[in-house]
């Protein structure tokens, strides 16, 4: 697969470069030249393959890595992710079943394998997104919904915006995701954009980085260029009505304050006997707010990134 820059229409880059560099020479972010799309028939196949096979398939598409399911099993274990079905149509995806009891261990292990075990110190920006996409596809394949390719919502902590970006791309690739429910401990660029149609460009660089790639995925080069120009001038960015409609069709943002998180965790444990981690609690808070506002009760995949038992 070749990659483009969010800030250029002409230059293209190899997967090897994307694995070792965060940005293009013009300061842009790497984006796929053309996203693959999985048909409903292909989505149904997810439930018939192992977790490792599904992860390998997606990563091979992005990086031509020639990985196998055995490669994934060897570096991550045969069951690095487990799903726990709970009442109220909530499915918790525990992405931390490894020796470090943390998702970042699996992410680093997969990245090292992609880099031919060269023990790179830091996972690059797009590699993180691609690995999350692969994990989301593979995790969906372990759920009951995968057997009939049913839509699910995904609830998550959106602090770094890497995971929402990955979920957005997975949705565009054909993974049956209804809404991406983003919880933040405070208002941020995505919350501002969805609720106000505008956002300050004086925010943290990591938030703006995620937003640049998201805007590009919706409006292409022109929209991204306008956003970058606004950021350079440190002005308020106003999203177009069309783009705002596209965002609201797939994203929901809620503030789940640090004072609310412990009560969410305690209440969930009392009701279901399950101890969720603080990051999952932020995602669950977003799910509560979304369901209270819309009345929606679709099955929801809640992402848990570390053991909190």
Task: Please annotate each region the language model reported.
Residues 1-309:
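PLP-dependent amino-acid enzyme catalytic core
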């Amino acid at each position: 697969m070749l990659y483009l820059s969010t800030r250029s229409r002409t230059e293209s880059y190899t997967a090897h470069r994307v694995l070792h560099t965060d940005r293009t020479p013009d300061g842009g972010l790497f984006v796929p030249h053309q996203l693959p799309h999985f048909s409903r028939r292909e989505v149904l196949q997810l439930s018939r393959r192992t977790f490792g096979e599904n992860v390998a398939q997606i990563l091979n598409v992005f990086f031509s890595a020639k990985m196998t399911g055995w490669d994934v099993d060897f570096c991550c274990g045969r069951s690095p992710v487990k799903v726990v079905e709970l009442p109220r149509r909530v499915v918790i995806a525990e992405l931390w079943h490894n020796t470090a009891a943390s998702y970042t261990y699996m992410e680093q292990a997969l990245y090292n394998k992609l880099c031919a075990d060269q023990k790179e110190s830091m996972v690059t920006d797009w590699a993180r997104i691609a690995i999350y996409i692969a994990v989301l596809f593979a995790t969906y394949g372990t759920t009951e919904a995968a057997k009939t390719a049913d839509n699910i919502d995904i609830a998550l902590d959106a602090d770094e915006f890497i995971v929402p970006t990955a979920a957005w791309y997975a949705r565009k690739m054909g993974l049956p995701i209804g809404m991406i429910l983003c919880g933040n401990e405070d208002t941020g660029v995505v919350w501002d954009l969805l609720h106000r149609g505008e956002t300050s460009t004086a925010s943290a660089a990591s938030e703006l980085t995620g937003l640049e790639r998201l805007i590009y995925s919706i409006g292409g080069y022109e929209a991204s260029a306008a956003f970058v120009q606004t950021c350079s001038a440190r002005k308020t960015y106003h999203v177009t009505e069309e783009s705002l409609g596209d965002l609201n069709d797939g994203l929901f943002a809620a503030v789940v304050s640090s004072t609310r998180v412990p009560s969410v965790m305690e209440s969930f444990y009392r009701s279901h006997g399950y101890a969720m981690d603080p990051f999952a609690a932020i995602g669950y808070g977003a799910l509560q707010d979304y369901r209270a506002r819309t009345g929606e009760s679709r099955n929801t995949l809640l992402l848990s990134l570390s053991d909190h038992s």
